[in-house]
Structure formats: C-alpha cells, structure tokens
Amino acid sequence: MDSTELRKVFKMFDKNGDGRITKKELGESFKNFGIFIPDDELDATMDKIDANGDGCVDVEEFGLLYRSILGDDAAGRAPRTAAAAIGGEGGAPDDEDEGMREAFNVFDQNGDGFITVDELRSVLSSLGLKHGRTADDCRRMISMVDADGDGRVDFKEFKQMMRGGGFAALGG
C-alpha cells in the first residue's frame, strides 16, 4: 500500500482531521464496524498501537498496525488493491469509495473480495480485542450485514454497512 492509500484509510479513523487518532476516535470507528469495546480493552489496544506513548496514533503508527494485519504480503497487495478500487469501470473512484475499499481490504486478508468469519476474527484478534474472538461473535456480526446470505461480506454489503452506521445499524 502506498502512503496515499494509507492516509485515506487513516482519515476514516481520524474523525477531526488533526493527523492523530485518539482513543475516542478509535472507539467511534470500531462502533461504525458494529464493534463495541469496553474502555479497558480500548486502552490496551491503544497501548499496543501507540508506539511512542503519546496517547494518540499517528499515520506512521497506523501504518505499522495496518502492515501487521495484512502480513507479509502487504506490498504485493498494493497493485491489486489499486486496481480493485478503480473497479474496472474506466473512471477513477471517488475518495469515499477508495477509502472504503482500503478499509475493506484490511478485513479481506486473502484478497478474494469477501470478508469471512475467519478473516474478521483474525483482524479483531490482531488488534488485541476480546470482542469478536469467537467464531460465533464474528458469525453474528457478519449475518447482520450479509444481504445475500452467503455467510460473508462483499464490498457492496460493506459499503452499505459503513454508510448505514456499521454492523449494529443494519442489525435492527
């Protein structure tokens, strides 16, 4: 992933645009995914991500986290990610779609275009979160967004979820 793409994903978390993700912003971002994290767990996650200990996550720290989630193939995924963001429709996507595509790709670890129970569980676990560690938790979260009932989330379902306020909003 290049620095432009990383910054687009970062901006989805950096709600006030000051270049730093606070604990509150991180918590709000997780809520958009339908993930409600207790304060103590959010503190532990911030401690894990906040390498310099200033209480906020900057874009460099976020990049380290992002690469650790994607694993060793992060560099190899960048061209496929950019092509996927364009979607083969000839025109450049708008920034919102591109940012959502990058966020989607954090969860779609194998790059097949779907977020599975195992992928969701893996990402939540690498963030140090207890919520979503069981397959049943992840299955429930996915079922709230899975419009076509195939047991996984595609990009269209992900965009609908994000625009509708996260997993929780679609869960009724």
Swiss-Prot record:
Official protein name in the record: Probable calcium-binding protein CML28
CDD domains given in the database record: EFh (cd00051)
Origin organism lineage: Eukaryota, Viridiplantae, Streptophyta, Embryophyta, Tracheophyta
GO molecular function, one term: calcium ion binding
UniProt-annotated binding residues for Ca(2+) 1: 14, 16, 18, 20, 25
Reported function: Potential calcium sensor.
InterPro entries in UniProt: EF-hand-dom_pair, EF_Hand_1_Ca_BS, EF_hand_dom, EF_hand_pair_protein_CML-like
TM ranges: none
Domain of life (superkingdom): Eukaryota
